Amino acid sequence: MSHHIVEVRDLCHCYPDGTEALRGITFRIHHGESVAVVGANGAGKSTLLLHLNGYLAPTRGDVRIGDTPVVRTTLPEVRRTVGMVFQDPDDQLFMPTVFDDVAFGPLNLGLPPAEVERRVADALEQVGVAHLHNKPPYRLSGGEKRRVAIATVLSMSPDILVLDEPTTGLDPYARRQIMGLLRDFKHTKIITSHDLDMVMELCERTIVLREGRVAADGPTRDIFGNDELLATCRLERPLSMQGCPVCGR
């Protein structure tokens, strides 16, 4: 599989209740890009991400990872390349211990036990929670759960990391740790978030969704400097671009 391009073409998704969540989404992301997907609640961000490794199937259009279409028959191959971190880490952590959760993916690849242990150790070390390997996930803090959820994906050695609201609910210290971890991941990153200051720091490109459509796609600073666009899409400038609330500078 060529890992250099994530391509979404005329992607539409309609839920069983008739809700049109995505309406003709088209974009291309090259290997190594760090791209944010932003928009108001209900704009279609999470629905879009769930198509990138086949958790949802399109009503119309298609998604490709390199030359490989994301369809039922290619899901094992696609999911080795595209690692998905869900918004709620409790959706991702379901085994008795942290080690078991992080080992789950590599074991299902049929890797030898020694390789599984190496991958688990490396992934936990990368996210700074190696000391938690024997703990049950329900005993972890929110920030610890978030890091372990990322480790479950890193243990699969993905080329593309997809994250849905990775800093939601974290205290400032845990948020900064997660941002440092994501900054160190050198492959492709696709991130949805309402944390626009994080987006400013981590993503050179931003795609704005509005009512299931792409409203804008371009350099992050240009997007957040367009007040008319932000108002139309029910967004605001990041705090770092708003200036001092007292003196206006």
Curated annotation (Swiss-Prot):
Gene3D superfamilies: P-loop containing nucleotide triphosphate hydrolases (3.40.50.300). The keyword Membrane applies. Keywords: ATP-binding, Cell inner membrane, Cell membrane, Membrane, Nucleotide-binding, Translocase, Transport. Coiled coil: none annotated. Its EC number is 7.-.-.-. ATP binds at residues 39-46. GO terms for biological process: cobalt ion transport. Probably part of an ABC transporter complex. Responsible for energy coupling to the transport system. GO terms for molecular function: ATP binding; ATP hydrolysis activity; ATPase-coupled transmembrane transporter activity. Its main location: membrane. It comes from the Bacteria. It is an enzyme of class 7 (translocase). Belongs to the ABC transporter superfamily. Pfam families: ABC_tran. This is Putative ABC transporter ATP-binding protein GSU1281.
